[in-house]
Amino acid sequence: MNQKQKNIIERKTKDFCEEVKHLKLTEENKRIFNAFVYKRSKPYKFEIIDKYSNTIRFILCTNKLDDGVLHILLKHYQGKIGSVSATEILNLCEVIRNGEISVKENTMVYTLKQNGQIFKLIVALKKSKT
C-alpha cells in the first residue's frame, strides 16, 4: 500500500467514525464498525442465514487492498463507483439476509433493492473444512 492510499484510508476512517457516532449499534454493527476502524490483522468472521435458509460464513479481511475493508474504504465509501455510506456498510449483513442470490463462477452475489438503491455484496466461494 502506498502513502497516498494510507492517507485516504486514514481520512475515510475518521469520516466513517464521525458519520456513525450518533447511532445506536447492534452487536453485529459493532463488529463491522471494529473491522473498519481498528483493522486488526486477523479477519472478522461472520455467520448469517440468508432468506433461502443457507448458512453463509464469510470473513471480512482488514489488510487486503483487493477485497474487504480496505477495498470498500478506497473504492466504495464516499466513492464514485458503487458509493455507500457508513450506515449502509454497517448494515451489509442485511444484503445477505434479505437479498436475491445469484451464483457466478466462484462467487455468490447478493442483491438487495432498498429505497430506490441497489446494493450488491459479493461473497467468494471456498470449500468448507468441515
State where each predicted segment sits.
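Ribonuclease/tRNase effector modules and their secretory precursors
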Residues: M1-T130
